[in-house]
């Protein structure tokens, strides 16, 4: 494993404040780990005030902290930063550098002569690349990837094993896809006539922006007539489905096992929790948040946090809904009490 010095951290984090760290200049730090598991050669981090006591007891030699926890840990060797989690991510990358391409190409590939492969791009075993496709510079195409005709993949892409890019799919720079995801398969379009389901040709494309990351086993379908589009900076968890004609804005996050039905439009910075179902032709405005397990059948009217099943309720509305649901179990008891009161005051109870 890579080991790093204090001086490397100081170079990486020029805006950070290093406190009580002078005695650590000769230490070879061997990793970054949790407060409870850290040893004398480790770095750890304090995500919030909740973990201050754990931090005080930790054996880590150096802690990444925020300004709000720095005073409570002033006797420790600390790095004071504005964003603890972001800094932690940068430090982890020091210990675990990303795999870099070297331009190696397996002999067991099938690449059409008309395809263009950029410089310093790795191509693994059993990769196929179709006619007139363009692969950018500094990409890593892992084993078993299937790339159709006229596909474009931008510079710096990382394509996991057995991913499939159907004809005419376009993805931007620094695209990441983990294994077994598919892009540009036919949308689910059929018309029932003459006693059977007749397929509607799906002739649109999938067009994906820059800096998008897609987990394993995701499916993004081509549009029927227009393109399915994914904006810049989007991050999809495993097993996310995007149906035909969807328009996804920039920096959208979708957690695992969630699906967008056809022609859904998501604004920028939308967050969709896990196991959500978004019905067709809905629109979510910029910044909308859908809580995990929700199912939407109507478009939310404003930017808010929505939660529920076929309800489209804001979070405060859902809290009231939950209270009412709990009260239903007492309904028969309350009805009996009302009947008894009516008898006492001489009101005849009428059956409806």
UniProtKB/Swiss-Prot annotation:
Pathway the protein takes part in: Bacterial outer membrane biogenesis; LPS lipid A biosynthesis
Keyword field contains Repeat: yes
Gene3D superfamilies, sorted: Hexapeptide repeat proteins, MurE/MurF, N-terminal domain
GO biological process, one term: lipid A biosynthetic process
Catalytic reaction(s) noted: a UDP-3-O-[(3R)-3-hydroxyacyl]-alpha-D-glucosamine + a (3R)-hydroxyacyl-[ACP] = a UDP-2-N,3-O-bis[(3R)-3-hydroxyacyl]-alpha-D-glucosamine + holo-[ACP] + H(+)
Active site: 244
GO-annotated molecular function: N-acyltransferase activity
Protein's job: Catalyzes the N-acylation of UDP-3-O-acylglucosamine using 3-hydroxyacyl-ACP as the acyl donor. Is involved in the biosynthesis of lipid A, a phosphorylated glycolipid that anchors the lipopolysaccharide to the outer membrane of the cell.
Protein name stated in the entry: UDP-3-O-acylglucosamine N-acyltransferase
Organism, scientific name: Leptospira biflexa serovar Patoc (strain Patoc 1 / ATCC 23582 / Paris)
């Amino acid at each position: 494993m890579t080991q790093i010095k204090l001086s490397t951290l100081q170079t990486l984090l020029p805006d950070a404040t290093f406190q009580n760290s002078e005695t650590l200049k000769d230490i070879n730090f061997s990793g970054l780990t949790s407060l409870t598991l850290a040893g004398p050669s480790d770095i750890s981090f304090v995500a919030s005030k909740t973990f201050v006591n754990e931090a005080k007891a930790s054996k880590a030699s150096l802690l990444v902290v925020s300004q709000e926890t720095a005073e409570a840990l002033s006797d420790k060797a600390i790095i004071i930063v504005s964003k603890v989690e972001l800094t932690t991510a940068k430090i982890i990358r020091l210990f675990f550098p990303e795999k870099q391409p070297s331009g190696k190409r397996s002999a067991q590939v099938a690449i059409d002569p008309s395809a263009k492969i950029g410089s310093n791009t790795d191509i693994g075993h059993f990769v196929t690349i179709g006619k007139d496709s363009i692969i950018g510079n500094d990409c890593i195409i892992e084993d078993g990837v299937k790339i159709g005709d006229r596909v474009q993949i931008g510079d710096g892409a990382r394509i996991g094993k057995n991913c499939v890019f159907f004809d005419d799919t376009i993805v931007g720079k620094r695209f990441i896809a983990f294994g077994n995801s598919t892009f540009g398969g036919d949308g689910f379009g059929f018309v029932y006539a003459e006693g059977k389901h007749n397929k509607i040709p799906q002739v649109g494309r999938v067009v994906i922006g820059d800096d998008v990351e897609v987990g394993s086993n995701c499916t993004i379908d081509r549009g029927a007539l227009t393109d399915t589009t994914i904006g810049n900076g989007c991050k999809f968890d495993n097993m996310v489905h995007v149906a035909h004609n969807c328009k996804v804005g920039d920096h959208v996050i979708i957690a695992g096992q969630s699906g967008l039905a056809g022609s859904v439009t998501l604004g920028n910075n939308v967050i969709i929790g896990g196991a959500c179902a978004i019905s067709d032709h809905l629109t979510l405005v910029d910044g909308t948040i859908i809580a995990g397990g929700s199912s939407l059948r109507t478009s939310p009217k404003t930017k808010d946090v929505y939660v529920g099943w076929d309800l489209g309720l804001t979070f405060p509305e859902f809290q009231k809904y939950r209270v009412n649901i709990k009260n239903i179990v007492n309904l028969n008891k309350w009805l009996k009490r009302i009947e008894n009161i009516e008898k006492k005051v001489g009101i005849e109870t009428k059956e409806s």
